[in-house]
């Protein structure tokens, strides 16, 4: 089912965010040869928003409602871009997402914003492609990008690139990678290796550990010895604070290898996920990357005033997706171009200014984002390098 938004208004500020979406799927990008849906300048543009409503999970339902709220905020903020926003429930699964895509096509959707999960995105993509419709997925899984799919979530590649550049600027060019066994760890390792190569740094060593406490603790001594022997002055961790990050860094500290003293620790995940993480002794002085903190705070404040609840960390993706659509419609109408969502317009190198920072889509369907660097400092996250406000700056 879908809900038709009664809001048709306009952009008092450009909008688009960063965040991360969930799930991994391995698939080839869908071939996209059909022309993109044309926009009638005299009619509202039908935009399909796909959210994981009807999942049966209370947390997911809350996230879905947050995304709907944020999307309606974006429509309300739009100026001279009539959007007919329709909301489709995906249930957070591929089967419902495919059915939602079929309904969206039948309803005349000219672009799809969402869905959240990579498996749902993979199910939606071929249905949308057949109708000549582009998909702005909330996922950060690069394997689903390409063809008619553009992902909005912050990717490992973007995070790794930002952190490597910061380390290189600080003279730390000999880098090690400590990663957990499994798909997620291997994916993060690959992103870091590519960032090291792109930025002229050196890979000192890469070492993995098993995802169970007993074996992780036993492996820590050997990992510490390997790091010391490599002479690495920066160490990347791919793991999350919700999994093994705290334990592996504490185990390294017990084996006399510590951040700042022996090397600069850096992480692909958000180390500000809780106050407990920020006071973890083994993470003090460590770096991680986040969307623009000042813009994020501004959006969160606006969201709470408008909706009476705190914004979910991923809700800005929905705002930014709808606002990007509005910006492209405005630009197309100003130039008399009926092809508002062409690849050339989507991949404009100037990108979009989002509610949590700048981002732009790449030709392969992935994205780049402007991120800030934060340092763990006795229970707080301190910004040591701001996010850029346009592409081409040092922090982009």
What does each model-identified segment do?
Residues 2-396:
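Extracytosolic ligand-binding ectodomains
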